[in-house]
Amino acid sequence: MSQIENQWEQIKHIETGIMRHMLALGLDWNDEVAMARLARECKTFSAAHAQAVYASGDRTRKTRAELFAMVSIMIKTMEEAANENRDVHGGDVWKAFAKHLYS
């Protein structure tokens, strides 16, 4: 498998994880208000927040933390592809969320 095919597969896999976590949280990626709220929360989420979440044992908070980790991995994967002049992008779920993340 070529590098570009591997990056496409990674992005599809990450986006599937993001979608599953959104579904588990009862979030609709077509809901602009919910996606904007989620993006604001994601922008301020830190390693200290993650430690507190995992210490709490709260499954819903853990699911959110995992979602934010996947968002970070998605961004990193896309940055690596861009640095190699490769054109990769997420699908509908990623686009619905990312437009709020970057605004």
Label for each model-derived stretch:
Residues 1-6, 100-103:
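Short intrinsically disordered terminal tails
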Residues 66-103:
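Amphipathic alpha-helical binding modules
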Residues 3-6, 19, 23, 78:
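Generic alpha-helix detector with strongest preference for long hydrophobic helices that associate
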